[in-house]
Amino acid sequence: MADIKFRPLHGRVIVRRVESEAKTAGGIIIPDTAKEKPQEGEVVAAGAGARDEAGKLVPLDVKAGDRVLFGKWSGTEVKIGGEDLLIMKESDILGIVG
């Protein structure tokens, strides 16, 4: 795990995709070309939060280290420190696993 030199702003989070299994329960090996990108990841960094209509800071529900599920088309893929990551809004996260 590389030390990320990037801090997301407002209600955004940085997520590292969690690698999916390369083999099915029946023992069939899935080639890389047939795999779908996982929709599960680990929060690497989170912004301070968003402001409500009154200007009050509303903190995020997720924090670094949380394992999360997100939509198939959520986030923007970026490369930070040689690592492929996603930047997304907290609202794109469906829930926290565990």
Swiss-Prot record:
Any one GO CC term of this protein is:
cytoplasm
**Any one GO molecular function term:** unfolded protein binding
Q: Which CDD domains match?
A: cpn10 (cd00320)
Give the InterPro entries listed for this entry: Chaperonin_GroES (IPR020818), Chaperonin_GroES_sf (IPR037124), GroES-like_sf (IPR011032)
In the record, the note on similarity to other proteins reads: Belongs to the GroES chaperonin family.
| Database matches in NCBIfam families | PRK00364.1-2, PRK00364.1-5, PRK00364.2-2, PRK00364.2-4
Cite the record's note on assembly.
Heptamer of 7 subunits arranged in a ring. Interacts with the chaperonin GroEL.
Question: What is the protein name for this chain?
Answer: Co-chaperonin GroES
Lineage of the native species?
Bacteria, Pseudomonadati, Pseudomonadota, Alphaproteobacteria, Hyphomicrobiales
From the UniProt record, report the name of the gene that encodes this protein. groES
